[in-house]
A protein has these predicted regions:
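Membrane-embedded beta-strand positions in outer-membrane beta-barrel channels/transporters
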Residues: 43, 75-77, 110, 161-163, ...
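Outer-membrane beta-barrel "beta-signal"
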Residues: 161-164, 321-337
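Surface-exposed strand-loop-strand hairpins of Gram-negative outer-membrane beta-barrel proteins
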Residues: 51-75, 86-104
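Membrane-embedded beta-strand positions of outer-membrane beta-barrel proteins
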Residues: 44-46, 78, 89, 113, ...
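Transmembrane beta-strands of outer-membrane beta-barrel pores
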Residues: 48-54, 82-86, 91-97, 117-119, ...
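Short loop/turn motifs that connect adjacent beta-strands in outer-membrane beta-barrel proteins
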Residues: 20-23, 27-40, 119, 169-190, ...
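Outer-envelope beta-barrel architecture signal
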Residues: 38-44, 74, 83-87, 118-122, ...
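Extracellular/periplasm-exposed beta-strand and loop segments of Gram-negative cell-envelope proteins
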Residues: 67, 135-139, 146-161, 203-214, ...
Length: 337
């Protein structure tokens, strides 16, 4: 499966690299009544954001669920965009970091990038994390209080994925206007979106992921699982819409639903009763809000993506989610003569 995954990613990246030389293929002819292009302008911005991964454990026999999160923090950075070039540099802000006493320490490495061309969106994910805590531990474990959560420094995750989607109404609808600020949506418009993705989530721990203190009536058939993995190939379809208000304001909402086949693995050995290859679903959503004041702009963007898996026993449901939030303040400089 690793070979298939590697070949699949290679084909996607190879296709993307060759497509860059085909300017007409990537660049859409814009309806100037709907979209204003800032291609020749220099855009400088200050931004703060957070990227994280969530691990949701759901008992499929009832409403009970657990959520693990890494200890999060906000980045503070600066960015610049000019024509096809964009660069962003950010650093961790200690004052906005959650308490290590309460949530524990998380070690992390990865790149989470969202690329918007005129016709396509490309989401890239590489995330390696170690160290999680159980959200609202005191409601699940009687020995914990609100002052300190149940911490799992042994839980680690490796998440890799790429998603490519085509924007059908690319002449009138602009993702760039909502999330990269290199264009302006002048009139409200929407678009059908379709494409595909390949995603790999791997989670492991030194002992069972479900805490031993949890009431034994929950997760009765899957309390000993310490490893899980998902390799998914999905076809995606969805819709995005941008509502323009007060001439310079924009509110964008999109939802993409994916379905396909995925390989599920649990533990070092696969139980014969577990159906590894099966059809499952994922979904992703985007929300953007922005407003322009002449050459200045303020933007808030939120992106959420989740891939689901479960045991054949119908006992444990696992949702792997990636989250991205960013607040930007920027200014546009005209370099045209």
């Amino acid at each position: 499966m690793k070979i298939i995954f590697t070949v699949f990613c290679f084909l996607i990246f190879n296709f993307s690299a060759e497509a860059k030389s085909l300017n007409g293929y990537l660049t859409a002819k814009k309806d100037t009544n709907y979209i204003e292009n800032y291609y020749n302008d220099l855009i400088i911005r200050l931004y703060s954001g957070e990227k994280t991964h969530s691990l949701d454990l759901n008992d499929l026999n009832g409403p009970y669920h657990l959520k693990y999160l890494p200890n999060g923090y906000f980045n503070l950075g600066t960015g610049v965009n000019f024509r096809s070039f964009g660069l962003s540099l950010a650093t961790k802000v200690p004052v906005f970091q959650n308490s290590e006493f309460k949530h524990g320490e998380t070690k992390r490495f990865g790149i989470q990038s969202y690329i918007y061309s005129s016709k396509f969106t490309v989401d890239l994910l590489t995330s390696f994390l170690k160290g999680y805590y159980l959200v609202n531990s005191s409601t699940h474990l009687s020995s914990y209080t609100k002052d300190k959560d149940y911490q799992r420094p042994d839980i680690s995750s490796a998440n890799i994925g790429v998603s490519v989607n085509y924007i059908f109404n690319n002449s009138r609808f602009s993702y760039r206007a909502a999330f990269s600020d290199t264009e302006r949506q002048k009139k409200s418009a929407g678009s059908l979106i379709a494409g595909g993705s390949v995603i790999s989530y791997r989670t492991k721990a030194d002992s069972a992921i479900v805490p031993r203190e949890i009431d034994p009536e929950y997760f009765m058939k899957s309390r000993d699982i310490s490893k899980s993995g998902v390799l998914a190939f999905n076809a995606n379809i969805g819709y995005a819409y941008s509502f323009v208000f007060l001439k310079n304001g924009i509110f964008t909402l999109s939802y993409v639903l994916g379905t396909g086949i995925q390989d599920n693995t649990f533990g070092s050995e696969v139980d014969s009763e577990i159906n590894r290859w099966r059809f499952r679903m994922n979904h992703s959503g985007r929300l953007g809000f922005g407003y322009r004041f002449n050459r200045y702009y303020l933007r808030i963007g939120v992106i959420r993506s989740t891939q689901y898996t479960n045991l054949k026993y119908n006992d444990l449901g696992i949702g792997n989610g990636t989250n991205f939030m960013q607040v930007s303040l920027g200014k546009r400089f005209s370099l045209r003569k």
